């Protein structure tokens, strides 16, 4: 996984390993797609990293997001795991990662279960996970699950040495 476009502020670049830490720590991602008409579209999604790929879900397959990915599977997901506005300095401390790749609908039942589990473990760990897994089993057929094969991954941060400790 490499960066395909040069980063302007190389001094703020973080390693691929640290970009994965950002992804695993973020509460959500923003998925960017482009429709067949060339119009961009971005929407928040619950995403999870598992075995080198990203998974996210939607409530139904017929949506602008799904139509865009069917027409053009190239997507980008932006994750922000930390942000703190520093008004007096006219800046923001942040930790972010951008993953670019191709999105494909997951149809294999074993992979669908794996994806649901990864999403539940990422976003509902602890005492709530059983409730969410039961929901996934009950409602799983009505949810569209997508896999993103990562083609490039980059991360960027202002104040990474301090933020890194806070991410764990």
Regions found by a protein language model. Give the residues of each.
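Short beta-strand segments
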Residues: 26-61, 77-78
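Helix-adjacent hinge/juxtasegments
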Residues: 64-88, 92
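Short, basic/aromatic recognition patches
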Residues: 2-30
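Charged, gly/pro-rich active-site loop segments
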Residues: 2-11, 82-168
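A generic structural signal for short beta-strands and their flanking turns/coil linkers
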Residues: 27, 43, 50-52, 71-75, ...
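A generic structural signal for nonpolar/aromatic side chains embedded in well-ordered alpha-helices
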Residues: 23, 68-69, 119
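Structural motif corresponding to alpha-helix initiation and N-cap regions
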Residues: 16, 62-63
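Anion-coordinating catalytic cores for phosphoryl-, nucleotidyl-, and glycosidic chemistry
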Residues: 11, 20, 54, 64-67, ...
């Amino acid at each position: 996984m490499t960066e395909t476009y040069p980063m302007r502020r190389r001094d703020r670049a973080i390693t691929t390993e640290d970009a994965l830490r950002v992804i695993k720590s973020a509460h959500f991602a923003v998925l960017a797609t482009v429709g067949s008409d060339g119009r961009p579209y971005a929407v928040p999604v619950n995403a999870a990293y598992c075995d080198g790929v990203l998974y996210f879900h939607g409530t139904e397959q017929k949506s602008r997001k799904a139509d865009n990915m069917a027409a053009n599977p190239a997507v980008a997901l932006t994750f922000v795991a930390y942000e703190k506005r520093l008004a007096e300095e006219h800046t923001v401390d942040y930790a972010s990662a951008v993953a670019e790749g191709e999105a494909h609908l997951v149809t294999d039942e074993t992979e669908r279960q794996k994806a649901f589990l990864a999403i539940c473990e990422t976003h509902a760990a602890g005492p709530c996970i059983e409730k969410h897994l039961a929901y996934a089993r009950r409602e799983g057929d009505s949810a569209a699950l997508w896999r993103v094969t990562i083609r490039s991954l980059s991360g960027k941060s202002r104040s990474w040495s301090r933020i890194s400790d806070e991410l764990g």
